Structure formats: structure tokens, C-alpha cells
Amino acid sequence: MRALLSTIGSRGDVQPLVALGEQLQALGLEVRLCVPPDFREWIEGLGMAVVPIGPEVRSTGKVDPLATLTPQQQRQMMEGTVASQFETIGAAARGCDIIVGATALQLAAPSVAQHLGIPYVFVAYCPIVLPSRHHAPPVLTWRGDAPPPAMADYRALWAKDAQDWNAMWGSIIDAHRAALGLAPVGDVRSYVLTNQPWLAADPTLGPWPEPDDAATSPTVTQT
């Protein structure tokens, strides 16, 4: 059995997937990782195959690249990011039996898994990534977000967050899905996070606040 583990981020995003990969290897699985090129030499030294994706994170860690761009340049970068993901993850996933994606920039992996007819699992490292009436969505300053008041209506904020996901990524993702013969995505955030994500966080330090409103929250498995 072969598993593809994919993330786009810095060391804190990559290392948990590497730990998962080592455990899967110990169980006899073949593991392949899609990660930024910075980590290739280290991970290959652990006996796992690496397919580089995205830019080196060292070059983007000091300044948020989107914060310094015009809206048109932001759109071009977003389109390029999605196109690169569909190409890279699409090639890396060939011959794999499952895709595990971590961090919310997994914009192509769910479509690639659907196209190949294999399972896809999204993993969050912190409860705040996942919709819940008990906390606010992540604050993205480059998008113009500001921290909400302590007693804000979190459900309304999550509803707006879903609208923002659709506005930012919907048409870009749907264009690539159409090329694969897949239907458009109605809810981009749910498409990325899935309805049954894993929460890889210590249940004491980062517990999932159950019970919750099933109409607005996914069914979370805390690992």
C-alpha cells in the first residue's frame, strides 16, 4: 500500500507529517511526501520519497508575499498556486492508495483523490482551523481580517468565512476540476477541510469542543 502525504508550509506543518510517515513505514506502507523543497534532503535521508511542491519556505518566511501585491497580482499568484498543485499532486498521487493532506492550502488534493478514486483525509493541527460555534475562524490579515470581539457571533463569522473561501478559490478550483471531468465545488471550505477531518492535537491542550451544531461543524476525529 502506498500513501501520499501532502502539505504546503513551514517546519511546523511538515514535521508532523514526517512523523506520520515514519509510523506508516513501520507498518509496512510505502510513503511519498509532497512538501516544499527545503525539506527534501532531510526527508529522503529518512527513507521516504519526496516530490517538491511550491517555493522554498525560507524565501517566504520574512514577509507575507500576498500582503505586498496588488489585487491583480494576488489573483495571478493564486491561480499559479492552484495550477501547480494540480500538476504536482496529480503526478505524485499516481499509484497511491490514499492521500493525506495537512494545512488549509490543500486546494488540489481532494480533487486529485476524487479523480483517481482513492480516499482523501484532511488533517488539522489546531482546533481553530475547523468550523465551530465555540471559536472564531483564523484571522488572515492579508485578506483584511481583524480579530473579532470576544462575544462575537462565531456562527456568523464562519458563514462569512465560507463565502470568502468561495470568492477566493471557487472559480480557480472549478476550472481545473472541469478539466478532470469533475463537477464544480459548491462549498470550497468544506471541500478542502472535508466533513470528517482529523484533528492532530493533544486533547488536553487543544480539545475539540464537542458537542457542537452538526449543521455547521464537521465530524472531527481527534488523534
Give the label of every model feature segment.
Residues 2, 97-98, 196:
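Structural motif
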Residues 34, 160-223:
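A nucleotide-sugar donor-handling region in carbohydrate enzymes
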Residues 46-47, 116-118, 193, 216-218:
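Short, structured coil segments at secondary-structure junctions
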Residues 1-49:
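N-terminal subdomain of nucleotide-sugar transferases
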Residues 34-36, 53, 102, 123-126, ...:
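Generic beta-sheet signal
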Residues 49-98, 147-156, 173:
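Phosphate/nucleotide-donor binding subsite
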Residues 82-151, 204-206:
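Conserved nucleotide-sugar donor-interacting segment of glycosyltransferase catalytic cores
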